[in-house]
Each structure stands twice: as structure tokens, then as C-alpha cells.
């Protein structure tokens, strides 16, 4: 009996309309689609597709793709996804680049190990573009921080990568043992390629910035939380600095259990976790000068009341925060108050959420030359001991699953093939990273198996309806 003819090929415009409706909160779908064939890859990597994709989802907030961190454990990838399916981004090697901030489609890193001068690295997670920014030697200190923001006038900040940006660098220096310490901030402009005027203020206390990232309120006010609990305000327009204290500790809080956030009205807020509750504060200024902290909302957390719950990060644009318990890391969407377990608690101290609409880019690999990391990625280094043995066995299992998936394809058992490729893909992405060449064939086979599985289901449905 002759085999049935293949189904007709869908027109390109119909394929594009289908791909446009893949869910933004599961970016792995678009990435896998880009590996199915050259036509699909050309469609989803075209700038026109990205504009339409973002426009189609203009009424929803951009999703949290994952987070960056500075925890020194080579078993944990530099970028940890929070999405449903396997997904990865080629983040800079955190052995050398400490993540500081992420905003408006750009992430900022600091390199300060064993050099006389520090250096910043700007990375666009979606395009993969990188740019190094030298930091003046006079700014060098132990624990500085920095913030990045889009500098394009009138930008809606939903797709502003590649445009002008600004960086604010904040640091503290002890002038002498008997004098106050000086906290300074300086603004860098990508349009001029230069640092601006240095603005400084003397305080009785030193400010180190290791465990918290910044928050941008409106278009002109940046806030930084020091490790000691003081909040530093920087005015982008005037360059003025101001420092003030966080909310009162009537609830028995401590500095390492709260973090900065945006309040419901768009102003400055603070989230802190006390026992099994999330306490949300906002800063109000009735006359523009005398500001005070006001309790905004209390969210009940469905966790053990004896568990320590530090607030690790706030996702600007997505209105979500990260908290950790003894065993797990959770992301809480503040509007719905829904909590989602992200991963195990690996001892993270600071998280930098990456918030953006994802579409595959034609330039996925890091270019060679000046934008390359100063050392090869962790997955290219030789590993020994128990960890090396475990990873070798995991990769052998991935190959076995891949071979079983190929055999299932030949036997037209597409459901089993998709399961095999999915498990193999999870192992290889965890080891190599989602954009590594070692994962490309698995992505391709997995996407093909899913398409065949869906086509088979559609054919069965058509036969039943007849």
C-alpha cells in the first residue's frame, strides 16, 4: 500500500502568523523553531518579526527570562532560566565579570580582579552584543556598584537594545582615618564615550555595594541599597546625591532580608520578608521634601514561618521579586501574588533578573576579538574529581537518549522521540549552554519530533471527525 502523500506546505505568511503567537514566557519555543529549517530561522530572526512580536503582546509586561548571579559554583550556569522549557543565554563568565545590573535590554558587569583599574562590560542578552567601558583609576574601591539605563528620548523601553545608553558608577573612598568617608557617583554617556562630572558627598559611614542592585524610578532617579542598609539616591538630571534610611525596623527586620523595588504608584518601594509574610513599603513625600515610609501591603507567603526568607531581587518591568527559603528559590508575581518555584537554593546572595521579550537573533555567538571573555567558558575547562565523573556519565546518558530518539523517529514513534530528545536537551543545555553548537542537533531533532507529533495528532483528529 502506497504511503499517504505529505501534507501541503504552509505558506510563509501563515507560518509567521503561527510563530508570532508562541508564548513570550516560554522563549525556548521560538529558539527551537529557529532550528527547524532555514526558512523558519530567517523568519524569526528578521527585525520585522521582532517588531510585530512585541507589538502583538504590547498589552502585557515583558517576561522574566531568568537571572544573573555572582555565586561562585561552577556547577551553576552564569544565566539561570526561570522559563518552563530549557533555555539559555551566553552570559559573560562570572569568574571574571561580576553582574551588577540589568535594565532596558542591557546587563552590566564589573571586572576588578587583579587589575590596577576596573572595567565595565555591557551585554545585550537578546542580540549578544558586548561593549567594554574603562573605569577611571581614581574610581577604584573594594565594592562599587553601577546601573545602566536607556538614554533614548521618548523610548518605551520594550525594545531599545542597540541605542544610546548611560551608566552611573557609584563608589566610596576613605579619605583619612579620622575624616568622613566620601561617596561619589559619575555618569557615563555612550553617545560621547566619556565620563561626566564627578559628584561627591561626605558621610559618617562607608557604603559598600555587594548584595543589591539598583532601581530606576521614573526617568531621573536611581536608587542603590548599600550592604549596611542605607539607601543612596542619584538624580540623573542634576547629579545630586542623597542618602536616607530604609523603613523602620518595627517588624524586627535586618539589612539582608529586604530589597529595593518599585511601589504600585511607580515610586520607590521596599520589600522585606518577615516570618511568613512579605511586607511592602512605599516612600511618600507630601510636600516634596519631607518624605516618609508608608506601609503599602502585606502578602501572606505559604511557607514555613520558621524559614528565613531574604528578598534577593526585583524584576523591573515585570513587577516580580525573588525570595529564597532554606531549600528553594521562588519568584513572586506581586500583582497576582502567585509564587513559582524556580530552582534549589544554591546560596545566592544577589540576583539580577533579566526582563525582556525574546526573539532569536541572527548573531547568536559572541564575536571574537576585543569583546571576548578574558578566559574560556567554564564548560571548556578540564574538570576533575567526582564532579568530572558525574558530568561524563550525564553526557553519556544524553547521547544514549539522543540515539533512542533517532531510533524512535525511524519507527515513527514521535511521542517517545520527543521525550528522549527533551531529556537529552536538558542535560546538554545544562552542560554546554543553550546556544552551544553541541546542542544544535538536539534542538533540531526535538523540534522535528514535536512537529511530527503534532501533525500525527492532527491527522488522527481529522480521521475521527470524518
What is each stretch, according to the model?
Residues 394, 433-439:
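Helix N-cap/loop-to-helix boundary motif
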Residues 451-466:
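Short coil/linker segments at helix-helix boundaries
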Residues 1-379:
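N-terminal entry/capping and adjacent linker segments that precede and initiate structured domains
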Residues 385-399:
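TPR-adjacent "capping" and linker segments in tetratricopeptide-repeat scaffold/adaptor proteins
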Residues 425-429:
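Amphipathic alpha-helical segments of tetratricopeptide repeats
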Amino acid at each position: 500500500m502506497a504511503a499517504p502523500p505529505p501534507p501541503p506546505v504552509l505558506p510563509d505568511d501563515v507560518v509567521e502568523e503561527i510563530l508570532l503567537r508562541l508564548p513570550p514566557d516560554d522563549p525556548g519555543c521560538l529558539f527551537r523553531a529557529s532550528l527547524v529549517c532555514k526558512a523558519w530561522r530567517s523568519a524569526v530572526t528578521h527585525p520585522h518579526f521582532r517588531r510585530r512580536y512585541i507589538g502583538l503582546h504590547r498589552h502585557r509586561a515583558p517576561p522574566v527570562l531568568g537571572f544573573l548571579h555572582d555565586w561562585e559554583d561552577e556547577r551553576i550556569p552564569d544565566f539561570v532560566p526561570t522559563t518552563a522549557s530549557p533555555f539559555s543565554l551566553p552570559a559573560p563568565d562570572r569568574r571574571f565579570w561580576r553582574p551588577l545590573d540589568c535594565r532596558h535590554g542591557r546587563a552590566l558587569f564589573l571586572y576588578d580582579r587583579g587589575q590596577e583599574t576596573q572595567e565595565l562590560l555591557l551585554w545585550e542578552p537578546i542580540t549578544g552584543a558586548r561593549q567594554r567601558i574603562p573605569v577611571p583609576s581614581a574610581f577604584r574601591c573594594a565594592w562599587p556598584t553601577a546601573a545602566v539605563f536607556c538614554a533614548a528620548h521618548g523610548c518605551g523601553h520594550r525594545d531599545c537594545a542597540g541605542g544610546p545608553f548611560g551608566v552611573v558608577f557609584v563608589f566610596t573612598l576613605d579619605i583619612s582615618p579620622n575624616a568622613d568617608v566620601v561617596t561619589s557617583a559619575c555618569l557615563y554617556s555612550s553617545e560621547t564615550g566619556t565620563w561626566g562630572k564627578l559628584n561627591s558627598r561626605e558621610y559618617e559611614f562607608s557604603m559598600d555595594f555587594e548584595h543589591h542592585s539598583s532601581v530606576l524610578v521614573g526617568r531621573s532617579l536611581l536608587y542603590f541599597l548599600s550592604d549596611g542598609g542605607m539607601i543612596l539616591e542619584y538624580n540623573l538630571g542634576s547629579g545630586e546625591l542623597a542618602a536616607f534610611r530604609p523603613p523602620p525596623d518595627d517588624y524586627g527586620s535586618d539589612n539582608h532580608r529586604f530589597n529595593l523595588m518599585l511601589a504600585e504608584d511607580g515610586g520607590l518601594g521596599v520589600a522585606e520578608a518577615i516570618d511568613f509574610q512579605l511586607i511592602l513599603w512605599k516612600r511618600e513625600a507630601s510636600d516634596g521634601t519631607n518624605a516618609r515610609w508608608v506601609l503599602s501591603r502585606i502578602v501572606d507567603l505559604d511557607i514555613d514561618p520558621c524559614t528565613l526568607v531574604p528578598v534577593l531581587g526585583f524584576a523591573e518591568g515585570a513587577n516580580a521579586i525573588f525570595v529564597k527559603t532554606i531549600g528553594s528559590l521562588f519568584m513572586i508575581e506581586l500583582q497576582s501574588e502567585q509564587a513559582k518555584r524556580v530552582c534549589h537554593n544554591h546560596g545566592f546572595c544577589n540576583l539580577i533578573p533579566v526582563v525582556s521579550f525574546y526573539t532569536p537573533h541572527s548573531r547568536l555567538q559572541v564575536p571574537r576579538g576585543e569583546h571576548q571573555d578574558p578566559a574560556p567558558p567554564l564548560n571548556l575547562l578540564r574538570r576533575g574529581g567526582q564532579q568530572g565523573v558525574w558530568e561524563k556519565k550525564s553526557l553519556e546518558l544524553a547521547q544514549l537518549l539522543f540515539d533512542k530518539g533517532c531510533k524512535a523517529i525511524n519507527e515513527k514513534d514521535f511521542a517517545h522521540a520527543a521525550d528522549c530528545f527533551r531529556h537529552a536537551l536538558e542535560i546538554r543545555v545544562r552542560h554546554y549552554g543553550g546556544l552551544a553548537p553541541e546542542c544544535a542537533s538536539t534542538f533540531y531533532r526535538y523540534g522535528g519530533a514535536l512537529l511530527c507529533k503534532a501533525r500525527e495528532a492532527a491527522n488522527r483528529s481529522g480521521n475521527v471527525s470524518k
